[in-house]
C-alpha cells in the first residue's frame, strides 16, 4: 500500500468510527431501507456497451490530494444534468471529505437531478459504509484492492450485494487483479492506470491487465483517458466501459467535453 493510500485509509477509519458513534447501525439501516431502489449500475453499462457506444461513468470531483481544487464552480446537480444530456451512462461522485472535498450531499444532489445510476466513489474500509452508501441512494460502491485484504474486500462486496448494489473492483497491477478474480464475484473490474506511488498515468496498465480478464468479467478503464484515441486504444484490448473525471472537471463545459469524447 502506498503511503498516501495508507494515510487516507487511516483517516477514513477514524472518520467512520466518528460517524458510527453518531449514527448507530440501526438508524443508518432504517435510512437505507427507505432509500429509492438501486438503478442497476452494471446493467446500464452493459446496455450501452452492447449497443456499440462507449459506456461512460462520468465523475463529479471537486478536488484531489495531488491536484488540489479542480473545479471552483462546483455544483453536483448542474454537472449531473450536463453529463446526462451529453450521453453519460452512469455517474461517479466523490464523497470523501478530507482529501477530495467530497460530501454525501453531493451524491444525493446528483442522483436526484438525473435518472442515471451512481457510484459512491470513496475508500470503503468497513461494511457500515456500504449501508451508509445505500442510505445516500448509491447504486454501486468501489472496492479498492490496494486498500483491503481479501477477507475485508469480500465482506464489503457481500454487504453491497445484500443491499442490491453493484460493486466496482479497482486494481492497479497484476497481483491485485489476480486477487480480485479470486476473492470477488463482481463482473466489474476497474483498472486504474494511475500509479499510486508516482501518480503518473500509463494506459499500458490496462493493456497488460486485459490479458488476465476472463470472459465472465468486464474491463472498466480508469484514469489517464483524455481523447477519443485513448478510448479506441482501450477498446482494442476489450475495455468498452470508462471512468473519467478530472479531464471533464477541468473543461469549461463538461457536456461539450463528453460529446467530444464519446459523440
Swiss-Prot record:
It is an enzyme of class 4 (lyase). Keywords: Amino-acid biosynthesis, Aromatic amino acid biosynthesis, Decarboxylase, Lyase, Tryptophan biosynthesis. It comes from the Bacteria. The keyword Amino-acid biosynthesis applies. GO terms for biological process: L-tryptophan biosynthetic process. The keyword Amino-acid biosynthesis applies. GO terms for molecular function: indole-3-glycerol-phosphate synthase activity; phosphoribosylanthranilate isomerase activity. Coiled coil: none annotated. It catalyses: 1-(2-carboxyphenylamino)-1-deoxy-D-ribulose 5-phosphate + H(+) = (1S,2R)-1-C-(indol-3-yl)glycerol 3-phosphate + CO2 + H2O. Its EC number is 4.1.1.48. Pathway: Amino-acid biosynthesis; L-tryptophan biosynthesis; L-tryptophan from chorismate: step 4/5. Belongs to the TrpC family. This is Indole-3-glycerol phosphate synthase.
Amino acid at each position: 500500500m502506498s503511503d498516501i493510500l495508507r494515510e487516507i485509509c487511516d483517516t477514513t477509519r477514524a472518520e467512520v468510527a466518528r460517524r458510527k458513534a453518531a449514527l448507530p447501525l440501526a438508524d443508518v439501516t432504517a435510512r437505507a431501507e427507505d432509500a429509492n431502489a438501486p438503478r442497476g449500475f452494471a446493467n446500464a453499462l452493459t446496455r450501452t456497451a452492447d449497443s456499440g457506444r462507449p459506456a461512460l461513468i462520468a465523475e463529479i470531483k471537486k478536488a484531489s490530494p495531488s491536484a488540489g481544487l479542480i473545479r471552483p464552480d462546483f455544483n453536483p446537480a448542474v454537472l449531473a444534468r450536463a453529463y446526462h444530456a451529453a450521453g453519460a451512462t452512469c455517474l461517479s461522485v466523490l464523497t470523501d471529505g478530507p482529501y477530495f472535498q467530497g460530501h454525501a450531499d453531493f451524491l444525493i444532489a446528483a442522483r436526484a437531478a438525473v435518472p442515471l445510476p451512481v457510484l459512491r466513489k470513496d475508500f470503503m474500509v468497513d461494511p457500515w459504509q456500504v449501508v451508509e452508501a445505500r442510505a445516500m441512494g448509491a447504486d454501486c460502491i468501489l472496492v479498492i484492492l490496494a486498500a483491503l485484504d481479501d477477507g475485508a474486500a469480500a465482506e464489503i462486496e457481500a454487504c453491497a450485494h445484500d443491499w442490491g448494489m453493484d460493486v466496482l473492483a479497482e486494481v492497479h497491477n497484476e497481483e491485485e487483479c489476480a486477487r480480485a478474480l479470486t476473492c470477488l464475484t463482481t463482473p466489474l473490474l476497474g483498472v486504474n492506470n494511475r500509479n499510486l506511488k508516482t501518480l503518473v498515468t500509463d494506459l499500458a496498465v490496462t493493456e497488460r491487465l486485459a490479458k488476465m480478464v476472463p470472459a465472465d468479467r468486464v474491463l472498466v478503464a480508469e484514469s489517464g483517458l483524455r481523447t477519443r484515441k485513448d478510448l479506441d486504444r482501450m477498446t482494442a484490448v476489450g475495455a468498452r466501459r470508462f471512468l473519467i473525471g478530472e479531464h471533464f472537471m477541468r473543461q469549461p463545459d463538461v457536456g461539450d467535453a463528453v460529446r467530444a469524447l464519446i459523440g
